[in-house]
Amino acid sequence: MHFRDFLKSNIVCLDGGMGTLLQAKGLCPGEYPEYWNLTHADTVTAIHQSYYDAGSNVVSTNTFGANSLKFSDTELESIIGAAVANVKRARAASHNGEEKFIALDIGPTGKLLKPLGELDFTDAVEIFAKTVRLGDTGSI
């Protein structure tokens, strides 16, 4: 079922926080949670599955801070690819009978736009577009 069709006749339940759960699992202060998609994939996948099992229809990838200002192009591609794969594994493993969708979680760049900051609007658009393109290759 397409998400748009699901919205017409259902109440949508979303997942909850990822960062706080990763901290409970050992994420250290200052450590990027996005790296856990690669280094602790089973932990991230288990968190996603727990949300699906609890009845969430939409689970977000662990990519809130994943952007080209924080990570190299190679890192960003690996992180987002792994993040999408982790949620897909969780979706496949969950058998609660609910419809299950995946959302690409995109947070702020961490920079202010001009004139308050130094980031050009067009550069910000490209930063977000790159993240979306990488997420889209994962066929969310």
Regions picked out by a protein language model, each given a short descriptive name:
Residues 1-140:
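Domain-level signal for soluble alpha/beta catalytic cores
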